[in-house]
Design a protein with these regions (language model features):
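Extended, alpha-helix-rich binding/interface surfaces that flank or overlap catalytic cores
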Residues: 1-56, 60-69, 79-151
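Non-transmembrane, aqueous-exposed alpha-helical and coiled segments at domain scale
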Residues: 72-74
């Protein structure tokens, strides 16, 4: 699967998942998805948010707990065979947890933008994802899911 094909596949699968859960993930519909489906959705949120505004945007938009503190990093590392990427997400999660209250607080646009300097490590993690992981991991995620999904 080429990179472009994997992006199309990822978006198609996750669009269907989002439709199935009624448009937005919530506590009341979490059990409608399998663990592998949650991994696909978590990766979609991660990829979309980090490509647009880094991990700071991902966290500010409310995806931090689901993507970084949920089972997604551990599943990648232990079951999906993506040890290095899973560990990378654990490193991001450690930085997130250390600054969680400040990162999740409501902010003006100006204060939000200032976080990119204030939390330089998270900003660098976003660059690292884009430079070192995104083009390699996206096809691996799509291929793993396609090969292991329930038929």
């Amino acid at each position: 699967m080429t990179y472009e094909e994997s992006v199309t596949y990822l978006n198609s699968v996750t669009d269907q998942l989002i439709k199935r859960i009624g448009g937005q993930l919530s506590e009341s519909n979490m059990d409608m998805l399998t663990l592998d489906e949650h991994c696909m959705l978590a990766y979609r949120y991660l990829r979309d948010e980090v490509m647009e505004g880094g991990f700071i945007q991902l966290i500010q938009n409310g995806y931090g707990p689901y993507v970084l503190l949920g089972p997604f990093p551990m599943l990648l590392k232990k079951e999906w065979g993506m040890k290095q990427f899973g560990q990378f997400l654990f490193d991001v999660a450690r930085e997130y947890k250390a600054n969680r209250e400040e990162l999740e607080s409501d902010k003006s646009e100006e204060d939000f933008m200032a976080q990119y300097e204030q939390f330089d490590a998270l900003n660098e993690y976003g660059d690292e994802y884009l430079d070192d992981y995104e083009e390699e991991v996206t096809p691996l995620i799509a291929e793993y899911y396609k090969a292991h999904k329930a038929n």
